[in-house]
Amino acid sequence: GYNLSKSYKSLKALDNVSINCKKGEIIGLVGANGSGKSTLFKILLGVLKPDTGNVTINSKKTKPIGGIIEKPALYEYLNAFENLKVFGRIQGLKITNDFVEESLKKVGLPVDRKDPVKNFSMGMKQRLSIAIALLNNPECLVLDEPFSGLDPMGISSLNTLITTLAEEQELAILISSHILGELNKICDRLTVIKNGKIIKSGTTRDIISQSTVAYTIAALDISSSLVLKKYDTTIKNNQATVKISYTDISELLYKLREENIHITSCVPEVDMNKLFEN
């Protein structure tokens, strides 16, 4: 999308927003409620028309872009198989049983489950919605808050699916979420939107690093470290939270390894106020 603007009466929901996503790339969109994320996604999917600007997708396919906006919109009284058949026909596809089975397998859903989707977990509903979004083989996928309502296992499983779609099918994927830690794991680039304007855009590492105020380091023997005593550190169980900048964290991790501290994870703690500073 290029130079996209959209107003609702006196409210400017989007103000000259430009965003791009390449084949095989995952772009994360970060913003508070009311920042313009859903409006942007609706414009990209053709649900809304922008007041100014345009959406360009380099694709000759029948459906160049697919997506989920907010909660999955499914026929709750139908099973997964039947949902795919209905949505396939709506999109003008000739649906065979083999095609439906392949679509379900692609997103990791069982092909033999016959009960209505109202019985499905939120994670399974998200997967089914993605299968529907992928009908007609679009080259771009837009996911608005796909982790909402999922437990940690469901989030991890969905992350794996998203990265697989980007890597193996070379889909361009644009995803929004309030869970910054998950975007940090899977996104190549991050874009920060505030009051309808893009205020930051860059590699995930750069955007996260600029707003990081501490790191939480996990290791079974972390409390035995002498190096950590030189830093502003809080140790609880097998985790140490260290107030340190991203420019110094690599050196600290090196020193911990020299002490034979077996690190299992190192997670940045982001100051959200800093992230949303213009």
Regions found by a protein language model. Name each.
Residues 244-278:
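C-terminal coupling/interaction segments
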Residues 141-145:
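Catalytic Walker B motif of ABC-type/P-loop ATPase nucleotide-binding domains
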